[in-house]
């Protein structure tokens, strides 16, 4: 089963939470969306010590590992806020970084799909090759990041219509990054 017209599969690269990019959110400067997510996770649970360690860390892998050490963490509470947090982060990321925003606009009109074979929450739990061969109804993951990026792209296309139109008509490859 092939989905090249409908989907834009990504895992790493510009649409990844680990992509280096400077952004400001709530007066705090971050070097990756992963850093922002882990910081806001720590702050949600009022763990200011780990939050500061996350800000001091420059590597997204280290930032993620620190995010797993948040004291007082509750999966149920995180589930209530995680999508809104990641939405706000990605809106800031693409609004404040024109080059990344243009790359996001180049995926119009395709639905963004995080083809991560290891992530069934933010991704689909399959790599792009296997996803293209599988009915989307059977993808094991939720694709929360892909859904959020699709929403952010739509909203930013309304905010930057000329840029979105120019980028989406460039005929970029949309199957993978």
What are these regions (language model features)?
Residues 1-177:
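Charged, low-complexity intrinsically disordered segments
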């Amino acid at each position: 089963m092939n989905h090249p017209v409908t989907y834009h599969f990504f895992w790493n690269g510009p649409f990844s939470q680990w992509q280096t990019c400077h952004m400001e959110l709530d007066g705090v400067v971050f070097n990756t969306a992963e850093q922002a997510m882990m910081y806001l996770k720590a702050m949600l649970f009022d763990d200011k010590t780990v939050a500061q360690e996350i800000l001091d860390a420059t590597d997204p892998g280290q930032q993620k590992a620190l995010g797993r050490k948040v004291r007082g963490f509750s999966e149920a509470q995180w589930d209530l806020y995680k999508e809104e947090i990641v939405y706000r982060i990605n809106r800031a990321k693409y609004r404040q970084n024109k080059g990344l925003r243009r790359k996001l606009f180049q995926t119009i009109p395709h639905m963004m799909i995080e083809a991560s074979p290891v992530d069934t929450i933010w991704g689909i739990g399959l790599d792009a090759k296997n996803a293209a061969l599988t009915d989307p109804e059977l993808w094991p993951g939720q694709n929360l990041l892909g859904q959020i990026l699709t929403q952010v792209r739509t909203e930013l296309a309304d905010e930057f219509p000329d840029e979105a139109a120019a980028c989406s008509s460039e005929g970029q490859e949309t199957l993978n990054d």
